[in-house]
């Protein structure tokens, strides 16, 4: 995807898999998009580079991502259960978020998942303290971190819901 904006500004503007009751565990409230550190922006660029291939939904399907649910403000959630483990891997998100658009699916964000059995506290995530891991108690208890790397979210890169995502249908 080409941008007319300088890359750092474009990345700063670009701003998540399991729905249900959540508890925000960040020490800060939603960081303003332009408050992200250079290190966080570099890591977000790595996530974008690694997931760009999933703009083609057939690639996500072939790589094992399967539909889980539609969550208002998050979109259609697809999870690759085979990569859910105790590790936070920027380049291999366990979840992808899509929205229906023009008779296809548009990639809007990623989600990282770490089972609660791996750590009682939020996992180390992106550099800095702007990411917000959430404890999800329903179903498989997990820590979840969403990043709206493909659809800007004026509420913050790591916010759970993006007001620009249409309601589930």
Where are these regions (language model features)?
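Sec-dependent signal peptide cleavage junction
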Residues: 20-32
């Amino acid at each position: 995807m080409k941008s007319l904006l300088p890359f750092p500004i474009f990345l700063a503007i670009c701003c998540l898999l399991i729905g249900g009751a959540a508890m925000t565990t960040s020490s800060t409230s939603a960081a303003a998009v332009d408050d992200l550190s250079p290190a966080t922006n570099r890591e977000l660029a790595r996530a974008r580079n690694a997931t760009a291939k999933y703009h083609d939904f057939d690639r996500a399907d072939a790589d094992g991502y399967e539909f889980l649910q539609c969550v208002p403000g998050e979109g259609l959630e697809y999870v690759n259960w085979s990569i859910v483990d105790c590790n936070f891997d920027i380049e291999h998100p366990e979840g992808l978020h899509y929205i229906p658009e023009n008779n296809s699916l548009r990639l809007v964000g990623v989600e990282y998942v770490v089972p609660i059995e791996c750590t009682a506290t939020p996992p180390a995530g992106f550099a800095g303290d702007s990411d917000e891991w959430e404890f999800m108690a329903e179903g498989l208890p997990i820590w979840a971190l969403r990043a709206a790397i493909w659809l800007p979210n004026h509420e913050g890169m790591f916010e759970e819901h993006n007001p620009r995502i249409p309601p589930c249908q």
